[in-house]
Amino acid sequence: MITRLGLIDYGMGNLRSVQIAFERLHKALHIVRQPADLSRCDALILPGVGAFDPAMVHLEQTRLVPDLKSWVKGGRPLLGICLGLQLLFESSDEGNATGLGLLKGHVQRLPSNQGERIPHMGWAALEHRNDCPLLDKEDPDSWMYFVHSYAAVPSQNSDLAAIAPFGRDNITAMVWKGRLGACQFHPEKSAAAGERMLRRWLNWLETGAKPVP
């Protein structure tokens, strides 16, 4: 059973809104600012708001990057949110920094020829692609709140858990591999549907966190 959750603070995350969301689920989060803080945690949350390059610089300054890579490669659970999803990939159109590289693929700027405003702000429905413990195909209310200008393009289709419409095309909404998952949207700002998703993540953790291939 996994009971101790860590929220990574590297200076570019929407920490308070995530904390409030988990407080509603009666779950306290331990703030992680340095490697020593990881000893108190069984699972991690990597939030993020802002640009890719500054985020990686801030994350490097915490000295957490090697530990985060070891954490995920060791099969321990981590959930990324918004920019936190993008940082899991190898690189981004938004800058020249190297991402964490925990998922293969590149983050691209949203296309300007789709008749949609950029940044993409608002609600969109999820369409399931591959198995993910955060998703419930029987849940009719799967609209989530997005705020972003970039979207990840996974190299491996098996890592793509859900997509969402953007103009005439679709974008990556969720990824999942093993015990590593992430949302491009903000579940903590997605009302009841987002709360149900976070509750499913907690239930998955508390029942053994079985990895998804």
Curated annotation (Swiss-Prot):
Pathway this chain belongs to: Amino-acid biosynthesis; L-histidine biosynthesis; L-histidine from 5-phospho-alpha-D-ribose 1-diphosphate: step 5/9
Localization in the cell: Cytoplasm
Main location: cytoplasm
Domain of life: Bacteria
GO biological process: L-histidine biosynthetic process
EC number: 4.3.2.10, 3.5.1.2
Residues of the Glutamine amidotransferase type-1 domain: 4-211
PROSITE patterns: GATASE_TYPE_1
Catalytic residues, chain numbering: 82, 186, 188
Catalytic reaction annotation: 5-[(5-phospho-1-deoxy-D-ribulos-1-ylimino)methylamino]-1-(5-phospho-beta-D-ribosyl)imidazole-4-carboxamide + L-glutamine = D-erythro-1-(imidazol-4-yl)glycerol 3-phosphate + 5-amino-1-(5-phospho-beta-D-ribosyl)imidazole-4-carboxamide + L-glutamate + H(+); L-glutamine + H2O = L-glutamate + NH4(+)
GO cellular component: cytoplasm
Keywords linked to the UniProt accession: Amino-acid biosynthesis, Cytoplasm, Glutamine amidotransferase, Histidine biosynthesis, Hydrolase, Lyase
A GO molecular-function descriptor: imidazoleglycerol-phosphate synthase activity
PANTHER family reported for this sequence: IMIDAZOLE GLYCEROL PHOSPHATE SYNTHASE SUBUNIT HISH
Function text: IGPS catalyzes the conversion of PRFAR and glutamine to IGP, AICAR and glutamate. The HisH subunit provides the glutamine amidotransferase activity that produces the ammonia necessary to HisF for the synthesis of IGP and AICAR.
Known partners and oligomeric status: Heterodimer of HisH and HisF.
UniProt-listed HAMAP family: HisH
Name the record gives this protein: Imidazole glycerol phosphate synthase subunit HisH 2
Organism placement in taxonomy: Bacteria, Bacillati, Cyanobacteriota, Cyanophyceae, Synechococcales
Gene behind this protein: hisH2
